[in-house]
A protein has these predicted regions:
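Short, well-formed alpha-helical segments that are part of the catalytic scaffolds
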Residues: 16-30
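A conserved acidic beta->alpha catalytic loop
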Residues: 26, 43-52, 94
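Glycine-rich, basic loop-to-helix element that forms the pyrophosphate-binding segment
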Residues: 69-85
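Short aromatic/hydrophobic "clamp" motif used to bind/position activated sugar donors
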Residues: 90
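Conserved donor NDP-sugar-binding/catalytic core segment of glycosyltransferases
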Residues: 102-137
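Conserved catalytic-core segment of nucleotide-activated headgroup transferases in glycan assembly
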Residues: 247, 524-533, 537-540, 668-752, ...
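Active-site and donor-binding regions of nucleotide-sugar-utilizing enzymes
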Residues: 360, 396-399, 424, 428, ...
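Catalytic binding pocket for nucleotide-activated donors in carbohydrate/polymer assembly enzymes
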Residues: 659, 752-756, 781-857
Length: 878
């Protein structure tokens, strides 16, 4: 068979006008020679300028053809291209992606050389994000060299993306299954490769896949949109590749597992928006499909983390046994060994040597603990029995996932060094003891680059097993005389070699003549640290206070001339020296990237010198469930300022804080709210933003997504409310105004909110909350200002089901559920209008239930900044 072209490149296009030119440029620049290629631009009903651009290229080049059709989806678009293809081979390229200049030449040459062996080949895939960074894929642990690979021997290739090329078999060409709403590419690849069960790989060619931030939700891969769709793909895969003995073909098993794995890690496996009964049924359906995957397929996958292997094995609910030997322990099913280990692993997150005591904090991770109870023992010197170490469930049990995948155990211990020479830990399983190995995170003072810590005359050194290349214990020495002087010189030489500039910062530490307190808000933000600094600054108590700023010009007008002398630029030399000598860091944000001039990772280099207490002032009352951000085990927080009994209970129950961590003074900003000011006849409507309706930061600006925004339930229902004749009439009747205030991230969408009423205004910039009679919101923490003012609140969440699914926010549940909040909870414009009318007719007096919740919420109302100062100085005096 003779073909007029070496290859046909099929480019499906839907509203891709910004990407078409770069895509075509990569094809025009192919080393094989552009005239030897056919380019099929398939316009799938675009509504932007895509078709005109494509037509221009088709008119300019005779080997570029435009196919236009009504919008039918990417599968139908590719099928149209396949039917029209005149090249010997067919290559697929999405409009927002590109390929390397040599790709077509390398691909066609390889296919020509192996034509009878394979029907499909792949080539190297690189993910590229908005910042231009590229990164590879785990399948290249298998596909290492250009060759033909037997899929029965390499089941975990799991080719799932369209960096592929197939033979053009004309009438015998396979088409994409248009009944699949997703994973149509995976099924097409399986169909084209399973007849020969071989796949070609061309390492020299590259496909650059443009990964949009937030694309998981935008493209419909989120369970909210597609849970039944991806289960249908699982069903089709299992029906098509079922073997005569009833088992699923192992190549199909590996592809199933691959999909389970990336969905688990991306938190898009479970349909959290289902009610309890529906959710349990959904989990059972997932268990059925993971049950089709053999244990050894799970255990041999290069894509799956070993601890996630345990998760999937337990998900299958197969019977298992645990064996405990004198030196090893194992977990196994009837046919497969799941776990085979000789020791547990301790992950140390915080290590600190102070006042003759070694503080160690971290978590125990051991594969066997997913299946069996485990204990941890501290062994000092030759103590054979050891001392039990208290274990609590670790926040890191959500391992590389938002789902609790494993049973890890948190520990914290303070070990007096006096009289001891060695420290080690053992785990106990079924009465048998096993040793441990140690891993140190970037925030721990110990690690591969720091095997010794010295404080005063105490030296603690890590034990390193050279054969196993692991850390196994700590050796303790009390130094004196010449040994002390020599070791001190060695330590200084080590720090000098490790970080030349940092060494001189270390030498400047510990030189303070008085107490130093640092106050931090975030760039561009005036928050609790500012208000507390203003309160504390004039107090004569021998404490030097400094407020940290990113840019003097941005904030200097907030300060008096005298105060400006104590403004310090973030990450400046002065900031670093003050930080190393500070006794308190008061910050509205608890990330080290906000309050530390050294950032998070380099901070460990100075950890043995730091004495500051990190006081987290908060930037609002935490009412959304955000364990990965706020758990004590994950954070650098020493003490936390709380304003309510709710917060104390919440931080204890959900985030692992203890009574000693709380400062119950209330946030300093609250003291600036004027509770005596009479409100104007105004209502504020201030919703939060949605992560699925706006793009990433590009050049310090969020990328807008107008199509998604305008079609969203969030926008449509808010607009219905704002344009409602009933709302206009209500405002006229009671002589009221309503200010709609988008979240700052969403302010660029303000132009889309239109109203015919002169009483409704769309605001930009700040608003003074004391001037409003009431607030309408969804999840905004500003609601607590109105609780503080004893003014009514209404909740309005038109996309509540999407919120529960995890589509709209970084959280999907509330620590303080809206149904138990401070006002009626509504989801439609009609419900909101009805509740608003009731409140207005009742002269803005909330129902008794909501009044009581407001009155009982705050610990204090007034003087929070002074109370905080008293709490901080009381502890200092103690």
């Amino acid at each position: 068979m003779t073909f007029p072209y070496d290859i046909s490149v099929i480019v499906p296009i839907f509203n891709s006008e910004t990407f078409i030119e770069p895509c075509m440029e990569c094809l025009l620049g192919q080393t094989v020679g552009f005239p030897r290629m056919e380019v099929l631009l398939v316009n799938d009903g675009s509504t932007d300028g895509s078709e005109d651009l494509c037509r221009r290229f088709a008119q300019q080049y005779e080997n570029v053809n435009l196919i236009s059709q009504e919008n039918q989806g990417v599968s139908a678009a590719r099928n149209a291209g396949i039917r029209a293809a005149q090249g010997k081979y067919i290559l697929f390229l999405d409009a927002d992606d590109t390929i390397s200049a040599n790709a077509v030449e390398e691909i066609t040459a390889f296919f020509d050389a192996h034509y009878e062996e394979i029907d499909l080949l792949t080539y190297r895939l690189y993910y590229r994000n908005e910042e231009g960074k590229t990164y590879g894929h785990t399948r290249y642990q298998i596909l290492k060299e250009t060759a033909v690979y037997d899929l029965e021997e390499n089941i975990h290739v799991a080719q799932s993306s369209m960096n592929i090329c197939v033979k053009n078999r004309l009438e015998q060409n396979l088409l994409f299954n248009t009944s699949l709403a997703l994973a149509e590419d995976q099924f097409y690849i399986m169909e084209n490769s399973m007849q020969k069960k071989k796949i070609g790989y061309v390492r020299e060619a590259s496909y650059f896949y443009f990964r949009h931030s937030g694309a998981t939700t935008a493209s419909g891969n989120h369970p909210y949109y597609c849970f039944d769709h991806f289960l249908y793909f699982f069903q089709l895969l299992s029906d098509t590749y079922r073997l005569p003995d009833g088992r699923l073909d192992r190549v199909a098993q590996a592809l199933l597992l691959y999909n389970f794995n990336w969905r688990l890690k991306g938190d898009v496996l479970y349909p959290y928006h289902y009610d309890a009964a529906e959710f349990e049924h959904a989990v059972d359906r997932l268990r059925y499909y993971i049950g089709l995957v053999d244990d050894d397929v799970i255990l041999s996958s290069p894509h799956v983390d070993p601890f996630h292997m345990n998760y999937f094995l337990r998900m299958k609910r197969e019977p298992y046994q645990i064996s405990f030997g004198p030196k090893r322990f194992a977990v196994h099913s009837e046919a497969n060994l799941w776990v085979d280990e000789d020791r547990g692993e301790l992950v140390f997150r915080k290590t600190r040597l102070r006042g003759g005591t070694l503080h160690l904090e971290g978590f125990l991770k051991c594969p066997a603990s997913d299946f069996y109870d485990i204990s941890l023992y501290l062994k000092l010197d030759q103590d054979r029995g050891g001392t039990p170490v208290a274990l609590t469930p670790s926040a890191f049990s959500r391992y590389k996932s938002s789902v609790e995948t494993n049973r890890f155990w948190a520990f914290s211990c303070d070990i007096p060094l006096e009289g001891h020479t060695h420290i080690a830990f053992e785990i106990e399983l079924e009465g048998r003891r096993y040793p441990t190995r140690y891993y140190f995170t970037v925030r721990a003072a110990f690690g591969k680059k720091q095997r010794k810590l010295m404080k005063g005359h105490d030296l603690v050194e890590l034990d390193f097993d050279k054969k196993e290349e692991i850390f196994t214990g700590f050796t303790v020495q009390k130094l004196s005389g010449f040994a002390f002087i020599l070791q001190k010189l060695k330590m200084e030489a080590h720090y000098l070699r490790r970080n030349f500039k940092g060494f001189f910062y270390r030498k400047a530490a510990g030189k303070r003549k008085h107490e130093i307190w640092l106050y931090n808000d975030r760039h561009g933000v005036i928050d609790n640290a500012y208000y507390q600094f203003k309160h504390d600054f004039g107090i004569a108590d021998r404490v030097k206070r400094y407020y940290i700023v990113d840019a003097f010009e941005d904030k200097k007008h907030y300060f008096t001339r005298k105060e400006r002398k104590y403004l310090v630029k973030f990450k400046s030399l002065r900031h670093k020296l003050l930080f190393l000598n500070s006794s308190k860091v008061l910050s509205s944000f608890h990330s080290p990237g906000v309050f530390s001039p050294f950032g998070s990772i380099p901070l460990a280099y100075y950890d043995d010198l730091l004495y500051y207490e990190m006081v987290y002032l908060q930037h609002g009352i935490l009412h959304a469930h955000l364990p990965n951000l706020y758990e004590k085990e994950r954070s650098d927080i020493d003490r936390i300022v709380v304003s309510s009994d709710f917060e104390i209970k919440n931080f204890r129950k959900n985030y692992g804080f203890l009574p000693m961590h709380f400062i119950p003074s209330g946030m300093p900003r609250l003291s600036t709210i004027d509770r005596t000011q009479r409100p104007e006849r105004r209502i504020i409507f201030a919703p939060s933003w949605r992560k699925n309706l706006i793009g990433p930061y590009i050049d310090n600006r969020r990328e807008l997504m107008p199509q998604q925004f305008l079609s969203s339930k969030f926008y449509c229902e808010i607009n219905r409310f704002l344009q409602s004749p009933k709302l206009s009439a209500l405002l006229d009747r009671y002589d009221l105004a309503l200010d709609f205030k988008n979240h700052p991230i969403f302010e660029e969408y303000n132009a889309y909110f239109q109203t015919n009423s002169s009483r409704i205004h769309v605001l930009s910039g700040p608003a003074k909350m004391e001037t409003y009679q009431m607030m309408i919101t969804d999840f905004s923490s500003i609601v607590f200002d109105f609780v503080y003012l004893d003014r009514p609140v209404l909740y309005f969440v038109p996309d509540y089901e999407m919120f529960r699914a995890g589509v709209t926010h970084t959280y999907r549940e509330m620590d303080l559920p809206l149904e138990k909040g401070f006002g009626a909870f509504t989801q439609t414009a009609e419900e909101l209008l009805s509740q608003l009318e009731r409140l207005i007719e009742n002269h803005f007096v909330p129902e008794p239930m909501y009044q009581k919740r407001m009155q009982d919420f705050f610990l204090h109302k007034g003087g929070e900044d002074e109370l905080l100062y008293q709490y901080l100085t009381q502890k200092q005096e103690q």
